[in-house]
């Protein structure tokens, strides 16, 4: 059985889905893209966004604000959004920039 160090910290199925969507779109993804994926695949948006935050925290992906500046995300940021146990649309409004694989 793999150790905790070897286990991904995020949902690998969601990460794969998002990566494929990024490849098809060939440009950074936005909340609008994630909302569309959630509808198309009958998933919760907060599950997708939790995965995106974890990918960014572990530098697999990066988040850029609406001005295009790379914004590092950390576990504290994610924990602060989870006060109500789920990420809501209101929580995510501040993240109106774009997401792309880390380079």
Features from the language model and the residues they span:
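Long, charge-rich, low-complexity intrinsically disordered regions
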Residues: 1-103
């Amino acid at each position: 059985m793999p150790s905790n160090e070897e286990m991904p910290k995020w949902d690998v199925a969601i990460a794969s889905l998002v990566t494929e969507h990024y490849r098809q779109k060939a440009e950074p993804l936005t909340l609008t893209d994630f909302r569309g994926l959630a509808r198309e695949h009958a998933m919760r948006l907060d599950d997708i966004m939790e995965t995106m935050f974890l990918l960014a925290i572990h530098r697999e992906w990066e988040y850029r604000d609406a001005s295009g500046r790379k914004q590092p995300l950390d576990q504290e940021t994610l924990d602060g959004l989870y006060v109500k146990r789920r990420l809501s649309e209101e929580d995510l409004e501040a993240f109106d920039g774009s997401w792309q694989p880390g380079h």
